[in-house]
Design a protein with these regions (language model features):
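RNA-contacting regions in translation and RNA-metabolism proteins
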Residues: 1-166
Length: 166
């Protein structure tokens, strides 16, 4: 695994050490998965953000079905990064610009579903989504005059319902 670190903050702190320690963790993780990966880290110490951009020939495997594998890896990396951190660091793991593409897809889905709800005058329940994806749907339709959204169900099966406003 290759690693590049870009640091936006010039301050040195204990959090900066985490950037170095994560290298061993990710090496072990990707070696176990038998995936060759180049990792670029964008670490903004001032805003407590760490973005891991992954590149390699088999990134589809890391993304998984609807990003579930990528979300799981992000969770594991976040746990590892924050174990020794003085302050909480927000971790984002991305590859092939997947997160932005998924956001665009969900925003388009929200608009299409809103159109169908208006046309058919019936509520539509979407498939189960993680909290981040549900938030994208809610945000995409929050300013619509004719439809509203709500989440129903229990995790991990919570779904967004798009319905006509009364």
């Amino acid at each position: 695994m290759k690693e590049e670190v870009q640091k936006k903050s010039s301050g040195a702190g204990k959090d900066a050490e985490i950037v170095k320690k994560k290298n061993e963790y990710l090496n072990t993780l990707f070696a176990a998965m038998k995936i060759e990966t180049k990792v670029t880290i964008d670490y903004d110490e001032e805003n407590c953000n760490m973005v891991f951009d992954l590149e390699g020939p088999e990134m589809g495997i890391l993304i998984g079905k609807r990003g579930q594998t990528l979300d799981s890896l992000q969770y594991l990396v976040s746990l590892f990064v924050n174990i020794e951190s003085e302050s909480y660091i927000r971790v984002k793991l991305d590859t092939e610009n997947y997160r932005a593409r998924r956001k665009d897809t969900l925003e388009n889905l929200a608009k299409n579903i809103a159109y169908k709800v208006k046309r058919n005058r019936k509520s539509i329940t979407l498939e189960s989504m993680n909290p981040y994806e549900r938030r994208i749907i809610h945000s995409a339709l929050q300013n619509d005059k004719y439809v509203a959204t709500r989440s129903e169900g229990e995790e991990p099966y919570r779904k967004v319902v798009v319905y006509l406003k009364k």
